[in-house]
UniProtKB/Swiss-Prot annotation:
InterPro entries: AIP/AIPL1/TTC9 (IPR039663), TPR-like_helical_dom_sf (IPR011990), TPR_rpt (IPR019734). Coiled coil: none annotated. It comes from the Eukaryota. It comes from Homo sapiens. The lineage of its organism: Eukaryota, Metazoa, Chordata, Craniata, Vertebrata. This is Tetratricopeptide repeat protein 9C.
Length: 171
């Protein structure tokens, strides 16, 4: 168990190095490998094969902390990588960012990335929700402010069109 935690951390560090080098596909591969090492160790997730084979020893609180931190970091870093790759898979960015936010609801980077994903998925209400939370945590971040402004603009445009539609129907 300790070996799997260490291997996962090593893969995560390799992923971080690949990210710094701009090798996003390699980084994604390393983060996925890290998560695979952790699969089955997380006591909060149901086992795919319950009561089959010997149960492993329970994780210590320190090991559980390492497990969750490594998982969260990998998901956050996967979302960052995916935003750098063409074409961007915004569904996955959303999914990974929300996994981070399940454990760290105040994670500003995950809030921003979720907002960007929802913006590009054209769910502007959700984008606004996440971007407002991100701007509250990082009020000076120009990227957060820019996406929030773009989202507000799309929402205003949508509401104008909706109003005109209803005026045409009932006017």
């Amino acid at each position: 168990m300790e070996k799997r935690l260490q291997e996962a951390q090593l893969y995560k560090e390799e992923g971080n190095q690949r990210y710094r080098e701009g090798k996003y596909r390699d980084a994604v591969s390393r983060y996925h490998r890290a998560l695979l090492q952790l699969r089955g160790l997380d006591p909060s997730l149901p086992s795919p094969l319950p009561n089959l084979g010997p149960q492993g020893p329970a994780l210590t609180p320190e090991q559980e902390n390492i497990l969750h931190t490594t998982q969260t970091d990998c998901y956050n870093n996967l979302a960052a990588c995916l935003l750098q790759m063409e074409p961007v898979n915004y569904e996955r960015v959303r999914e990974y960012s929300q996994k981070v936010l399940e454990r760290q609801p105040d994670n500003a980077k995950a809030l921003y990335r979720a907002g960007v994903a929802f913006f590009h998925l054209q769910d502007y209400d959700q984008a606004r929700h996440y971007l407002l939370a991100a701007v509250n945590r990082q009020p000076k971040d120009a990227n957060v402010r820019r996406y929030l402004q773009l989202t507000q603009s799309e929402l205003s445009s949508y509401h104008r069109k909706e109003k005109q539609l209803y005026l045409g129907m009932f006017g």
